[in-house]
């Protein structure tokens, strides 16, 4: 584990994978992008990008089973933590969570 002082000073990369429910139509899957777009105005976000899983070749280390991934960069851990409690974020999760059956989050200190 990294020293706490380093984690507090570094930028945070928030990487999220979403597995959408299989019964969703192609149109509903594309419409899910509204979830990501609704997060963009949140003041704590430094960068935000998202996309569908790439159809890359099958390899033992590759997992393309998710539908969408989201990558957000925060200036620091405090901004990350504030984002988690932000009303816009919480409202978006409440509105769109009916579309997924699994979510995995990886938070990383980056330089």
For every predicted segment, state its role.
Residues 34-46, 64, 73-106:
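An amphipathic, aromatic/His-enriched active-site/gating alpha helix that lines ligand/cofactor pockets
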Residues 1-10, 51-64, 93-111:
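Glycine-rich beta-strand-turn "strand-cap" elements at beta-sheet edges
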Residues 18, 23-26, 111:
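Compositionally biased, intrinsically disordered low-complexity regions
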Residues 24-30, 80-82:
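Short, conserved charged micro-motifs
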Residues 11-20, 56-84:
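Short, well-ordered beta-strand segments in beta-rich or mixed alpha/beta enzyme
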Residues 7-12, 29-35, 66-70, 109-110:
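A broad, low-specificity signal for short, low-complexity segments enriched in glycine/proline
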